[in-house]
Amino acid sequence: MLNEELLPIWLDHDCGHDDAFAMLLAFHSKIFNILGISSVHGNQTVDKTTINALITLEIIGKSNCGYEVVKGVRSPMCRPEQVCSEIHGETGLDCPTAELPKPTQLPITDRPAIQVMFEKISKFYTDNQQKQKVIIVATGSLTNVALLFAVYPQIKPMVEVSLLGGSINFGNISPAAEYNILVDPEAAKVVFESGVKVIMVPLECSHKALVNEKILERISDIEKADGKQTQFIKIIKGLLLFFADNYKSTFDFDHPPLHDPLAVAYLIDPTIFKCKLMRVDIETSSHLCLGRTVVDLFSMSKLQKNVHVCTDINVDKFWDLMINAIDNCYNHLYKSNILK
């Protein structure tokens, strides 16, 4: 594909296990022009999620290929920082059964992430004669994105947002709220009320994208076709198995949901989702329902509909996209002589 045929995106995430798979899907689906990567607090501290983004570039064979990681904000707009060690471990990318590579490149730390985001996104938009908007794929807290919109409001006509977060009915960090929204509800409110097109992939979709034995077998089959046992597949399965163990101990799930790649999958093939434009408000004051995405399913609100909410997913087609990307990554690593 020529560059002008690729879909321009910016990856903004709190790189944990499922964020790493979102990166893999984005880099190895061959339809994206990835303008940059920013880290943010969430699954772990921003220091750790920044390192994890760099590690993931090593794993997927994209380090030192011109893709920069810029270190984002370390805390929510109005609240104390929180992390999710019970799911992602002490590093945010724990993988006890396989040794992860060390980063060979450094992040950008001398300028605020939102400045870098603004410069790169606005340059692309201008150079492209305003023909293509850049889609910010947000799979962590929305603090970077909210601050970007607040400090550089002129960027709003240049972007859309595809995010993994929120829910229609239930939460995963409280009875009412999903984690990415709850860690910074004020930021989510800014983004949802920005006037920018927002695509929300909620828990109702991601809790159907389960990593079961059949999926693990399909991943194993990628290297079996070559009669090999590779460090890459060992890492991929190790990350998923650690994720599975923690979902079992925390939620008693038999299989873990691979949340974050869905925000990328929507951009690859929107037809695998059912989606509806609805009014969504963010609860920022209730003790019981803090961080809830209040989704107006029946158009009761008089306020303008503001979010394209995904309500269902074709799980088989999602996994076809994900397995194909893992296979593409595997082949890329061998062709580049990264895997021996």
Swiss-Prot record:
GO terms for molecular function: hydrolase activity, acting on glycosyl bonds; metal ion binding; purine nucleosidase activity; ribosylpyrimidine nucleosidase activity. Pathway: Purine metabolism; purine nucleoside salvage. Keywords: Calcium, Glycosidase, Hydrolase, Metal-binding, Nucleotide metabolism. CDD domains: nuc_hydro_IU_UC_XIUA (cd02651). It holds the Pfam family IU_nuc_hydro. Belongs to the IUNH family. It is an enzyme of class 3 (hydrolase). This is Probable ribonucleoside hydrolase. Substrate binds at D18, N172, E178, N180. Catalyzes the hydrolysis of the N-glycosidic bond of purine and/or pyrimidine nucleosides into ribose and the base. One of its GO terms (biological process) is pyrimidine-containing compound salvage. Gene3D superfamilies: Ribonucleoside hydrolase-like.
